[in-house]
Amino acid sequence: MVTQNKKILIITGSFGNGHMQVTQSIVNQLNEMNLNHLSVIQHDLFMEAHPIMTSICKKWYINSFKYFRNTYKRFYYSRPNELDKCFYKYYGLNKLINLLIKEKPDLILLTFPTPVMSVLTEQFNINIPIATVMTDYRMHKNWITPYSQRYYVATKDTKDDFIEAGVPASYIKVTGIPIADKFEESIDKEEWLSQQHLDPSKPTILMSAGAFGVSKGFDYMINNILEKSPNSQVVMICGRSKELKRSLKAKFKDNPSVIILGYTNHMNEWMASSQLMITKPGGITISEGLSRCIPMIFLNPAPGQELENAYYFESKGFGKIADTPNEAIDIVSDLTNNEETLKVMSSKMLESKVGYSTRKICKDLLDLIGHSSQPDEIYGKVPLYARFFVK
């Protein structure tokens, strides 16, 4: 329990929505605990340190899912065993040091791969407690920070990855990936579907356009899914793509078995009430799906963390990879016409899911911060560096 004033600095990143969602889940949970002696601040380090360059990198990252997959693949898989090699290792260093001097946090929590943190721990002798929340299901070297005291990971397999990379087992906790508590709450599926003017007795296929990737061809997929699985109904989530939503609404306006939605705050209800989901394998989305035990189809996952997530879920029997829309349509047909297979997949997910991840992480963070040193004892060489180089 925190009995004196303490501060947590969360370093996150806005490359995709997942890292920010994880951060917000943790912040919300800590706020709900009404800890009067604890303050929590969060910073998008790279965006604040280099806004123009980071904005360019974000656009490249988003477009890499469509146009530069091989380039991103080479970047993601380059020198996997050289843990200290990263071309952006010093990116954001001055900003990070300024944050430490200004805020004097008692603990740093990373929800985004931040290689620059290793510079502080190795070269500047920072001994402030550092904890990391990994937001995917397979380890990548950029998540490793020397002298970090805690890694919160999704599964035992992820823990084994970290141990193999040299991280002590005692530093790693299998908590699951943090998601909102509402994904643990009971949902009346029949009531929800009836409210949406859908038939609760029919299999519901949930499709998500996702933040990145394809934005065309969904009309073809919906038509063919309904043709091959005529007893099904489809819910299409278009996200923030107004053009996609408008186009699909026009095409399916007279079909009562199809609902077209834009951005929604009700993914929890839709996941809980559907039998199958077609989605991109982002760490947060599939963690929410795992919590709701909804089997998933991963449509043409991008090389890198998405593909690794998809491989992992497929190996565990939680989902299937479809390289093309036609392959996805065939998988939907096979699964909706084989109810027993869907039940087996859901049962495997139920056995494997880790509940209340955010609560577990926050409880452990409070234990870590309760044993942290006083601020004037933890900053090593940073003040001297800052005096001469940091403005």
Swiss-Prot record:
UniProt-recorded Gene Ontology molecular function terms: 1,2-diacylglycerol 3-glucosyltransferase activity
Top-level EC class as recorded in UniProt: transferase
Catalysed reaction equations from the record: a 1,2-diacyl-3-O-(beta-D-glucopyranosyl)-sn-glycerol + UDP-alpha-D-glucose = a 1,2-diacyl-3-O-(beta-D-Glc-(1->6)-beta-D-Glc)-sn-glycerol + UDP + H(+); a 1,2-diacyl-sn-glycerol + UDP-alpha-D-glucose = a 1,2-diacyl-3-O-(beta-D-glucopyranosyl)-sn-glycerol + UDP + H(+)
Source species: Staphylococcus epidermidis (strain ATCC 35984 / DSM 28319 / BCRC 17069 / CCUG 31568 / BM 3577 / RP62A)
This protein's UniProt keywords: Carbohydrate metabolism, Cell membrane, Glycosyltransferase, Lipid biosynthesis, Lipid metabolism, Membrane, Transferase
Protein name from the UniProt record: Processive diacylglycerol beta-glucosyltransferase
Entries under InterPro entries matching the protein: Diacylglyc_glucosyltr_N, Glyco_trans_28_C, Glycosyltransf_28_UgtP, Pro_diacylglycrl_glcsylTrfase
Gene this protein is translated from: ugtP
Job description of the protein: Processive glucosyltransferase involved in the biosynthesis of both the bilayer- and non-bilayer-forming membrane glucolipids. Is able to successively transfer two glucosyl residues to diacylglycerol (DAG), thereby catalyzing the formation of beta-monoglucosyl-DAG (3-O-(beta-D-glucopyranosyl)-1,2-diacyl-sn-glycerol) and beta-diglucosyl-DAG (3-O-(beta-D-glucopyranosyl-beta-(1->6)-D-glucopyranosyl)-1,2-diacyl-sn-glycerol). Beta-diglucosyl-DAG is the predominant glycolipid found in Bacillales and is also used as a membrane anchor for lipoteichoic acid (LTA).
The keyword Cell wall biogenesis/degradation is annotated on this UniProt entry: no
Family: Belongs to the glycosyltransferase 28 family. UgtP subfamily.
HAMAP family: Diacylglyc_glucosyltr
A Gene Ontology cellular-component term: plasma membrane
SUPFAM superfamilies (UniProt xref): UDP-Glycosyltransferase/glycogen phosphorylase
GO BP: any one term: lipoteichoic acid biosynthetic process
Location within or outside the cell: Cell membrane
Pathway entry: Glycolipid metabolism; diglucosyl-diacylglycerol biosynthesis
Source lineage: Bacteria, Bacillati, Bacillota, Bacilli, Bacillales
Entry EC no(s): 2.4.1.315
Gene3D superfamilies recorded: Glycogen Phosphorylase B
